[in-house]
Amino acid sequence: MYPIPSWVYDSVVYQIFPDRFFIGKGKTVEDKKDLYLKRGGTIEKWGVPPRKLPGAQHVKVFYGGDLWGIAEKIDYLEELGVNAVYLTPIFLSDTNHKYDTIDYFKIDPQFGGKRAFVHLLKVLHSRNIKLILDGVFNHVGSQHPWFKKARKKDPEYVNRFFLYRDRHRSWFDVGSLPELNVEVEEVREYILKVVQHYLEVGVDGWRLDCGHDLGPLVNLWINMKVKEFSSEKYLVSEIWTYPAGWEMVDGLMNYNFRSLVLSYVNGETDSIGTELERAYRETKNIFGCWNMLDSHDTPRLATTVPVKDLRKLAIVLQFTYPGVPLVYYGTEIGLTGGEDPECRATMEWNREKWDMELFEFYKKMIRFRRTDPGLRFGEFILLKEKPLAFMRKAPHPLQDTIVVVNPEEEKNVVLSLPDGKIMNATPLFDIFTGEKFHVDGGVVKVPVGRRSFRILKPIDLRVGRYRLYKRV
């Protein structure tokens, strides 16, 4: 296990599906139509909801978003407060999702090509925003040169795939996604060469697609290459399991967290504290894991949790549980959408259509998560199961953070705070309401409203020249 890069502890990641974020250089998808039509695609106007088509033809429908457009929205990213961007694949491919790579060393012209990529990287770094790329190394697209040669029985390439008499092995048996034989040395060297190349260009990390399919050893090999380049480069892996046991990478996409939290706020269970505490204790790289609530592979948060007060509870947990919060583009303004492709709708740029109250809530949570020591690296201590309450215990008691999340009716909650340096009479300040609750013998009593939450911070008590924490 390698140390997690230092910048990860302070990060909030923003996920972007490039075709659906923004079209740069003042263009429309109509202006760019030749880029799509000549490669078998179709185009659609911005704002028209995506829909599933027969034969999965929706993967060939393009809206025109590109890397130029992302760079032009840098002020928006800065306003929101995120400091890392994760892009779904950007390499040459004939689909809008680009998980069927044709050439890893070519940025797709549909996204602006190499010039747009270099420009975006420069713009992001000028605002101290990191860039994380999506590495799809479990499989390639059926148009990848290697696979085309293998299909023709070229002996140099046949063993790089899994070919049978009448078919080939592919991801989830999707024929257009032939799986690579990562046990073959030439395949591993090729993958590591791709990883090395973009680290040299300046990207800050990689997200490994289908990390579970790659297996622990390949995850380790890739992270060894990443850390050989720099200990400050980041590797996170897509693994839809309980998060423990994958310490060979810096973290994984914590879908286990997502499932627990959504079940809790939607009333499918009345307690998840034990599960969260166990995962924290057993997952050695928990601080490098992504706290997910939605993504390009799931229904959007506003669809799975339509009641906004309950949705806020999920967001509070996302930003206060150990790990890196990941915000899927548009979730911060209330975009809805079901299963793929509905969850991959275009970003709405008309602010009159935004849920501005939700947007401001996200901004505050992002700012708090990035600056609060307790949330950045504090220990997770479960205080109560019903309603869920926990402490993020930091090195200094005034850096501690206490969180209570109540998806049910109003409750008066009594919490014993397991930090012997939180002094008697210490005020606990609610960062949202401004209310104060005083500690009495290490215990605090807090009313928590229906479908509501508390985020409490200790503050130093001063009476005249007297300071409660003068020697702590």
Swiss-Prot record:
One function term, GO molecular function aspect: cyclomaltodextrinase activity
Q: Which domain of life is it from?
A: Bacteria
Keywords attached to this entry: Carbohydrate metabolism, Glycosidase, Hydrolase
On temperature dependence, the record says:
Optimum temperature is 85 degrees Celsius with pNP-alpha-D-maltoside as substrate. Remains stable after preincubation for various periods up to 48 hours at temperatures between 50 and 90 degrees Celsius, pH 6.5. The half-life of the enzyme at 95 degrees Celsius is 2 hours.
UniProt record, GO biological process: carbohydrate metabolic process
Q: Where is this site: Transition state stabilizer?
A: 297
Q: How is its activity regulated?
A: Addition of 1 mM MnCl(2), NiCl(2), CoCl(2), ZnCl(2), CuCl(2), or 0.1 mM HgCl(2) inhibits the enzyme activity to 0-6%. Activity is increased in vitro upon addition of CaCl(2), DTT (relative activity 147%), KCl (180%), or EDTA (180%), as well as after heating of the enzyme. Is not inhibited by acarbose, a potent alpha-amylase and alpha-glucosidase inhibitor; on the contrary, acarbose is degraded quantitatively by AglB, yielding glucose.
Q: Which family does it belong to?
A: Belongs to the glycosyl hydrolase 13 family.
Name the chain's protein. Cyclomaltodextrinase
